[in-house]
Curated annotation (Swiss-Prot):
Gene coding for it: rpsC
Protein name according to UniProt: Small ribosomal subunit protein uS3
NCBIfam families, A to Z: rpsC_bact
Keywords, alphabetical: Ribonucleoprotein, Ribosomal protein, RNA-binding, rRNA-binding
Molecular function per GO: mRNA binding; rRNA binding; structural constituent of ribosome
GO BP, sorted A to Z: translation
Pfam families: KH_2, Ribosomal_S3_C
SMART domains listed in its UniProt record: KH
CDD domains assigned to the protein according to its UniProt record, in alphabetical order: KH-II_30S_S3 (cd02412)
Family according to the record: Belongs to the universal ribosomal protein uS3 family.
PANTHER family named in the record: 30S/40S RIBOSOMAL PROTEIN S3, SMALL RIBOSOMAL SUBUNIT PROTEIN US3C
PROSITE patterns for this protein: KH_TYPE_2, RIBOSOMAL_S3
Gene Ontology annotations for the cellular component aspect, listed alphabetically: cytosolic small ribosomal subunit
Signal peptide stretch: none
């Protein structure tokens, strides 16, 4: 039975950038990695209602620079920048180095896989029918220009006794094509019947610019065989 590799992991360094961009020596690598994980978990918990898409971390010269991608930057920044200053102090305390916080707005949340997955999870927790939530997410993404989208939910759907998985797809989602820009995310909805897992794949088009294109060489014409004897 065929298994699916993580679409983001297999494209790292090809068409997908890394979420943490820094270099460290062997003795500092583990502590930096642990710090990144703690910072992400803290921001994910703190910014639950801010439609958090992703967190990009850089570490220039004994400091940390965190870029928060969100669909609701006003919620993150707060009144006169008070909330973002609290976040900066908290991140600095967790990482143990001076911190800088940047906010990047997600213009089309319907085209962001993480925000779509979180939205479906939120609807399932509010007892919205799972098929309606899936179909609405697919229609919104296709309306805003996605080339294809696939949504899968699994668990005790509708309170059924036996867990199952259901998916809905529209357009094309070429997971084998490495130049395809596939946005992938997972989320979990905690319902009264148990945990519902949500997976979202969004195909936004193909990325050609970062890949070296080979020049096409015309094939040589086959030589015609003759049976004539030399005179």
């Amino acid at each position: 039975m065929g298994q699916k590799v993580n679409p983001t992991g297999i494209r790292l360094g090809i068409t997908k950038p890394f979420a943490s961009t820094w270099f460290a020596s062997n003795k500092d690598f583990a502590s930096n990695l642990d710090g990144d994980h703690k910072v992400r978990e803290f921001l994910k918990e703190k910014l639950k209602r801010a439609s958090l898409s992703k967190v990009v971390i850089e570490r220039p010269a004994k400091s940390i620079r965190v870029t928060i991608h969100t669909a609701r930057p006003g919620v993150v920044i707060g009144k006169k920048g008070e909330d973002v200053e609290k976040l900066r102090l908290a991140v600095s305390k967790i990482a143990g180095v001076p911190a800088q916080i940047n906010i990047a707005e997600v213009r089309k949340p319907e085209m962001d896989a993480q925000l779509v997955a979180d939205s479906i999870a939120s609807q399932l927790e509010r007892r919205v029918m799972f098929r309606r939530a899936m179909k609405r997410a697919v229609q919104n993404a296709m309306r805003l220009g996605a080339k294809g989208i696939k949504v899968q939910v699994s668990g005790r759907l509708g309170g059924a006794d036996i867990a199952r998985a259901e998916w809905y797809r529209e357009g094309r989602v070429p997971l084998h094509t490495l130049r395809a820009d596939i946005d992938y995310a997972i989320a979990r909805g905690n319902t009264t019947y148990g945990v519902i897992g949500i997976k979202v794949w969004i195909f936004k088009g193909e990325i050609i610019g970062n890949m070296p294109l080979q020049a096409e060489v015309p094939a040589a014409k086959p030589k015609r065989k003759t049976n004539r004897k030399p005179k």
